[in-house]
Curated annotation (Swiss-Prot):
Carbamoyl phosphate binds at S57, T58, R59, T60, Q84, R108, H135, P136, T137, Q138, C272, L273, R317. Its EC number is 2.1.3.3. It is found in: Cytoplasm. Reversibly catalyzes the transfer of the carbamoyl group from carbamoyl phosphate (CP) to the N(epsilon) atom of ornithine (ORN) to produce L-citrulline. NCBIfam families: orni_carb_tr, PRK00779.1. Pathway: Amino-acid degradation; L-arginine degradation via ADI pathway; carbamoyl phosphate from L-arginine: step 2/2. This is Ornithine carbamoyltransferase. One of its GO terms (cellular component) is cytoplasm. It is an enzyme of class 2 (transferase). Keywords: Arginine metabolism, Cytoplasm, Transferase.
């Protein structure tokens, strides 16, 4: 009998039910425990996994690679210079070729349509490692981290600070409300989430008992916050907008003043990384020299504070990605959830 996840792709949060998403989070926690105790879990023994990367990555590549190896699979990295998606070969043709050679495909790139075409034509599970619209594997790691810290998800309040229309904000809104988490977007009006994303999240919120708030008012945004979350001010492909974003988003920086507004000693801080919290990067130095800003979306004080959980969050990328690959490609018995 085919189990509920078998053969499915993982392209966007909206493709899964609340129960399915919760199952993947809990399954990831189980796999994390097995890893910590040194217990083998080779659910993908003999499988070959293609890792397609249009966009560069540290965490996503490392997480998929180690997760595949831990599961007994062989990962093969194909970077932007190795694949011809839509250039010399159509995505459809590439998908059909890769689907005959690999058992599963990860894609990290720009177009959501491209990852959907890979899933449509390859005949194997396809996992979205990030597109301009969605970042579903990040969400599993994020909400696993939240659950590890609070023991639950339902009824908590997560506040995202910064660019409210990027892929992380989209995914936090949809995944959070799906899971019963109140999601606040603290952003300038110019960068409020798209109306269709907000409406989608509001629909999930109505079903789960959560609520959605989109505001440019700091006091309103962080009231009752359990989680403060931020991301880089300039997404990949938007590097020419640094000056504009620095000026626009400086008031939305996560700093100790904002943390104190939440008035919650159990608050945690999350960041999907990389973070520009100092000048120890080329970008950091460049922004400091050009615009006089040494800390961008989060201050170094908060980044290194007792509230910070971003390195736990980064580790959880591996465990949650492992859960997705094992559930969709492994020959596991998973009853209907």
């Amino acid at each position: 009998m085919t189990q509920v996840f078998q053969g499915r792709s993982f392209l966007a949060e909206k493709d899964f039910t609340r129960e399915e998403f919760e199952y993947l989070i809990d399954f990831a926690a189980h796999l994390k425990d097995l890893k910590k105790r040194g217990i083998p879990h080779h659910y993908l023994e003999g499988k070959n996994i293609a890792l397609l990367f249009e966009k560069t990555s540290t965490r996503t590549r490392a997480a998929f690679t180690t997760a595949a190896i831990d599961l007994g699979a062989h990962p093969e990295y194909l970077g932007a210079n190795d694949i011809q998606l839509g250039k010399k070969e159509s995505t459809e043709d590439t998908a059909k070729v890769l689907g005959r050679m690999f058992d599963g495909i990860e894609f990290r790139g720009f177009s959501q349509r491209m990852v959907e075409e890979l899933a449509e034509f390859s005949g194997v599970p396809v996992w979205n490692g990030l597109t301009d619209e969605w970042h579903p594997t990040q969400m599993l790691a994020d909400y696993l981290t939240v659950k590890e810290n609070f023991g639950k998800l339902e009824g908590l309040t997560l506040v995202y600070c910064g660019d409210g229309r990027n892929n992380v904000a989209n995914s936090l809104l949809v995944a959070g409300t799906l899971l019963g988490v109140n999601v606040h977007i603290f952003s300038p009006k110019e960068l409020f989430p798209a109306e269709d994303i907000v409406k989608l999240a509001e629909g999930y919120a109505k079903a789960s008992g959560a609520h959605v708030l989109v505001t440019d008012n700091a006091d309103e945004a962080v009231k009752g916050a359990d989680v403060l979350y931020t991301d880089v001010w300039v997404s990949m492909g938007e590097e020419d907008k640094f000056e504009e974003r620095v000026k626009l988003l400086k008031p939305y920086q996560v700093n100790m003043e904002l943390v104190k507004k939440a008035d919650n000693d159990n608050l945690i801080f999350l960041h999907c990384l990389p973070a520009f919290h100092d000048t120890n990067t080329v970008y950091g130095k460049d922004v400091a020299e050009k615009f006089g800003v040494e800390e961008m979306e989060v201050t170094d004080e908060v980044f290194r504070s007792k509230y910070a959980r971003h390195f736990d969050q980064a580790e959880n990328r591996m465990h949650t990605i492992k859960a997705v690959m094992a559930a969709t490609l492994g020959n596991l018995f998973i009853p209907k959830v």
